[in-house]
């Protein structure tokens, strides 16, 4: 089969984002929710060649803040849609119709028979292929489309070409500025936390038995003080 028989070269991308901002009390206190979503299809060329079909990515953020602090959290998730690896699609599609061992056996037998009958190499090859590929579904036929659907939805790369991904990232940040409470310096403390949840069902990561999760945590503090040495020179120390 030609690659054009096995895939769709159309590319598309749809994106949207929105936000809700609420200030219930003072102008410096705000609650906000921001969402982003995108979906698309294309051909991707890397170490292998992929048909990215119906891939989607979304992110949602909730944040509470004022002039002295903020607390915010994100969740980012993706879905692979009906994506498949084009490198293995052709061979596995043919193997699903007729296993490679049977095909090569029929080919070799027909080639040898044609050669013994006086055919040239090109003639023997044509006759052998015609014998081995008798009944092969034609591209676009109902039988071909059934095979294509079965192989692209099969995530075992020995027999199929599809892969799945439904990974997520959870992230949170918090920061407080003691500027209104301490006058001799500007003091800030904060933290950052992130959890990765890899979930490719064994098609990308080694997670066939279940999602892989791992986390990161960071803490920080900052002290800053300014010294006005004269009207045109100021010294800032940060630690």
Regions found by a protein language model. Give the residues of each.
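Transmembrane beta-barrel wall of Gram-negative outer-membrane proteins
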Residues: 1-39, 60
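Face-selective signature of the C-terminal outer-membrane beta-barrel domain
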Residues: 61-239
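Amphipathic, alpha-helical segments enriched in basic
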Residues: 30, 37-39, 46, 90, ...
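Transmembrane beta-strand segments that form the barrel wall of outer-membrane beta-barrel proteins
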Residues: 35-39, 45-48, 233-239
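Structural signature of outer-membrane beta-barrel domains
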Residues: 13-15, 27, 34-42, 72-81, ...
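Surface loop/turn motifs at the tips and blade-to-blade linkers of beta-strand repeat domains
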Residues: 52-53
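Extended, low-complexity, charge-balanced
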Residues: 56-58
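Short secondary-structure boundary micro-motifs
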Residues: 4-6, 45-46, 160-162, 209
